[in-house]
Structure formats: C-alpha cells, structure tokens
C-alpha cells in the first residue's frame, strides 16, 4: 500500500522560522482605486473593486513608506511599486511619495527602487520625465495586437482606440530608456 504523502524533510526547520523577525523588503502601493480603462477581465471592476473609486492620500502613502523602513531590518534596498487601478490618475501623490522616500533614504541607510505600473493612457512628457529620473522600472500593460487590445481594454465611455493612444507612448518610453528598464 503506497502513501499519498512523503515525509516532510523541512519540518525540523519550522521552529527556526517562527522565531525569526519578519522583514519587509517591498510594497505594492494601491495608489489609485480608480482606472481610466474598462477592461473586460478586470478583477478590480474598472477600478471600483465592488466599491467606490478613491485615490490614496499622501498621508496614507507616507505611513506605508514609514512602515516599510521600520520593518525592513538591515535590508538596504527597498522596493515600492505604484499600482492601481491606474496610478497616473494620482500622479501628484506619486511624486510627493517619491520625494518623501528620497528624503528619508540617507538617515535610514536605505535606497528606494520605485516602479510605475501603468496602462499608459495618461502618459505625457511630465510623467515620463519624472519616471525616467525616479523610477527604476516602468511596467506597461497591453493585450496584444490592436484588435484584441481594443476589444479587451476599451477606453471608458468609448473614447477611441486604447491601442492607438498607448502605442506611440510605449515607443517613446522604450526610446527614452534606451530600450532598458521597462516591461510590457
């Protein structure tokens, strides 16, 4: 008669892990509880998450960065991903939080690596210049060729092709970053 499970060779180590302090190295900040697309498959229900639309305040974001620093132990490099919904809908707070993060790095012996995850609809020169200066990475979302992307990712209120809006911007991101440090 065979056994369904084998012996757990890691069981003797469990107590060692229970005694270790928790160390946080990264946060994904849900900076915008809102979105400017109406993706057919969106888990967020177009930014609402079955609730109201909202934007994170600077004060809440600041507390999140303080929490990350306070709970990062001896880790020097910390990561923060600005996510949503669509984070560029709350771009002023993104800028303020990056500025705050930079202001506390030296005193806390930390280095923040910021990432912006965006659908690209609101990308403009101001956002791109800031991202190229302050964001280690930019994550750009698209759903393939034009026909599929526009079917699955329509703009809110059907304001044209999302593909036609984002593709020139995505190309500009790639060129401005020398084809590096961005993900599609």
Feature locations, PLM:
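Short acidic donor-binding/metal-coordinating loop in glycosyltransferase active sites
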Residues: 31, 84-85
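Radical SAM/AdoMet-radical enzyme domain recognition
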Residues: 65-81, 90-184
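N-terminal charged/capping segments associated with class I S-adenosyl-L-methionine
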Residues: 3, 9, 47, 59, ...
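Short, histidine-centered active-site or binding-site loop motifs used for metal coordination
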Residues: 45-48, 82-84, 153
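Short, charge-rich binding segments
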Residues: 18-21, 32, 129-130
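A short, flexible beta-alpha/helix-coil linker loop
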Residues: 11-12, 45-50, 147
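N-terminal [4Fe-4S]-dependent radical SAM core
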Residues: 1-28, 73
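Canonical Radical SAM [4Fe-4S] cluster-binding loop centered on the CxxxCxxC motif
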Residues: 28-59
């Amino acid at each position: 008669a065979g056994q369904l499970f084998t012996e757990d060779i890691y069981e003797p180590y469990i107590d060692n892990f229970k005694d270790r302090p928790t160390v946080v190295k990264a946060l994904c900040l849900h900076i915008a509880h809102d979105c400017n697309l109406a993706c057919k498959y969106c888990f967020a229900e177009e930014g609402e998450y079955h609730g109201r639309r909202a934007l994170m305040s600077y004060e809440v974001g600041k507390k999140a960065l303080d929490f990350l620093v306070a709970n990062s132990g001896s880790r020097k490099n910390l990561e923060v991903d600005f996510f949503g919904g669509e984070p560029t809908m709350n771009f002023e707070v993104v800028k303020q939080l990056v500025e705050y993060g930079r202001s506390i790095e030296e005193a806390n012996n930390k280095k923040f690596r910021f990432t912006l995850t965006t659908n690209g609809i609101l990308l403009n020169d101001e956002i791109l210049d800031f991202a190229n200066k302050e964001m280690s990475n930019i994550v750009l979302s698209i759903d393939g060729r034009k026909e599929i992307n526009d079917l699955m990712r329509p703009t809110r209120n059907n304001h044209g092709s999302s593909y036609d809006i984002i593709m020139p911007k995505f190309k500009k991101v790639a060129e401005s970053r020398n084809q590096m440090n961005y993900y599609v």
